[in-house]
């Protein structure tokens, strides 16, 4: 399909609809919600054809983004919270729909979900899971549970932990990061250390746990297994924040197997569950304490970390799909997307660079694709290309600030690029541009390719 970039919102949505067809219908359903031409199933699709036609008010035009005056994005940055995380698969959307059909005891559902997670993720004996409102929420309720146990007065008092017998958390100085705010949110006091000897010396009767920031493990002097060994020797807990650290999927069971008492993973990143979801895997007793500190319980620090029944079902399906996914096959799909772009831009002297992919990286383990611009043929820099993609309308291609200072929410008007190549990127070569492709929907690689052709043609005509 040849998609022309006389960009307007109606033509774009029509094009995407033509590309995707029944993409958003549940697995096995076509865009009309039936299996093939005939089916006894009356189950409607989640998206594609609407469950309920909307003829008035919000949604009646078919373009909810335009109705609110906002710009949707083609995601070439990755699973960043600032742009909404990942794109859920149709099967996940279908479980969300089914999860909304009945009311249920949330505590009962969480306990059942925990058993499902533990089995799926090959958790050690005595471990279970918990669906949380994100990995940050998992840290809040996890640390709260460590300190309160099942004592109601403590659960009501937290974050005033001044009278708690144990309220200190040891953390390596190199492991300090924005998300340790969630530990401090519980009232716990962080004790910084640098070496193994300092870690051992810092342990005292007030120490409840040692925090381990997985993505920063190469920055510290005490490894994960060493941290676990020290904690076990002194009868204190360990918590591993591995929010963005799958794939590889094996980490879902490898980290608990090391002996961490609690490990959290984001549900809304590469697992591709609901954006406001997380997975907490830990010892059954600690997970029980964590659930006591979160919604649906009242007068608890985690009441604001509410997780709905729909989110729980969606996360479980996303996790199941992720664990059973053939990552090599997925990687081949990403390569094919990159080739579509390469084929479109090669006539401008723009050539592909080697794919950057380290499957054993500590976090954000996803391939990045880049292309080199011959400055003798095109008078445009790589950062300028990325900015022009972000400036595309009616739908932006890129984060428009997620990779720059807007990532931390300090400056939402920041440029789409910075001197370091965006989120977790190396210093940018002015004659190259690159991005991630794993969050693209079907057909969006062609949209990007056509937009790049338009950009480079405009440069030649200038």
Regions picked out by a protein language model, each given a short descriptive name:
Residues 1-36:
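N-terminal export signals
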Residues 13-16, 39-74, 78-83, 87, ...:
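Conserved PLP-enzyme active-site core in the AAT-like
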Residues 79-87, 93-94, 98-116:
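Metallocofactor- and cofactor-centric catalytic cores in central/energy metabolism, strongly enriched
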Residues 98-100, 214, 373, 437:
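Short glycine-centered, acidic/aromatic-flanked micro-motifs in structured strand/loop junctions
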Residues 103, 217, 245, 441-442:
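Short strand->helix junction
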Residues 93-95, 303-369:
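Structural motif of enzymes handling amino- and sulfur-group chemistry
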Residues 346-459:
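Conserved C-terminal alpha-helix-loop-beta "cap" of PLP-dependent enzymes
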């Amino acid at each position: 399909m040849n998609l022309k970039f006389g960009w307007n919102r109606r033509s774009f949505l029509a094009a995407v609809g033509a590309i995707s067809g029944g993409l958003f219908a549940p697995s096995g359903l076509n865009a009309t919600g039936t299996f093939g031409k005939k089916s006894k199933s009356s189950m409607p699709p989640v998206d594609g054809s609407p469950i309920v036609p909307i003829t008035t008010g919000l949604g009646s035009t078919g373009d909810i983004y335009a109705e609110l005056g906002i710009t949707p994005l083609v995601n070439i940055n990755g699973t960043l919270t600032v742009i909404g995380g990942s794109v859920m698969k149709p099967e996940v959307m279908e479980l969300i729909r089914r999860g909304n059909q009945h009311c249920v005891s949330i505590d009962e559902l969480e306990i059942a979900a925990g058993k499902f997670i533990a089995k799926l993720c090959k958790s050690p004996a005595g471990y279970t899971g918990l669906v949380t409102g994100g990995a940050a929420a998992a840290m809040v309720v996890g640390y709260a549970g460590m300190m309160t146990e099942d004592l109601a007065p403590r659960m009501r008092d937290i974050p005033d932990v001044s009278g708690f017998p144990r309220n200190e958390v040891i953390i390596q100085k190199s492991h300090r990061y924005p998300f340790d705010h969630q530990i401090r949110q519980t009232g716990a006091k962080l004790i910084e250390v640098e070496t193994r000897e300092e870690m051992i010396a810092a342990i005292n009767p007030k120490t409840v746990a040692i925090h381990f920031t997985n993505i920063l493990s190469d920055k510290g002097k005490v490894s994960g297994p060493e941290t676990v060994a020290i904690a076990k020797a002194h009868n204190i807990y360990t918590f591993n924040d591995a929010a963005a650290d799958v794939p590889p999927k094996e980490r879902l069971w490898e980290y608990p197997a090391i002996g961490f008492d609690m490990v959290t993973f984001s549900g809304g990143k590469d697992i591709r569950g609901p954006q406001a979801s997380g997975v907490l895997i830990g010892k059954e007793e600690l997970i029980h304490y964590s659930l006591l500190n979160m919604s649906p319980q009242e007068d608890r620090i985690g009441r604001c970390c509410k997780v709905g029944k729909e989110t729980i079902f969606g996360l479980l399906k996303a996790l199941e799909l992720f664990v059973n996914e053939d990552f090599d096959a997925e990687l081949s799909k990403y390569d094919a997307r990159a080739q579509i772009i390469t084929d479109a831009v090669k006539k401008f002297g723009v050539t592909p660079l080697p794919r950057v992919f380290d499957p054993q990286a500590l976090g954000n383990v996803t391939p990045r694709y880049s292309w080199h611009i011959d400055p003798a043929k095109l008078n445009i820099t790589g950062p300028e290309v990325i900015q022009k993609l972000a400036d595309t309308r009616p739908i932006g291609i890129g984060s428009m600030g997620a990779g720059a200072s807007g990532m931390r929410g300090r400056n939402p008007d920041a440029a789409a690029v910075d001197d370091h190549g965006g989120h977790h990127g190396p210093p940018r070569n002015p004659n190259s541009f690159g991005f991630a492709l794993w969050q693209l929907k079907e057909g969006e690689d062609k949209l990007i390719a056509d937009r790049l052709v338009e950009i480079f043609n405009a440069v030649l005509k200038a």
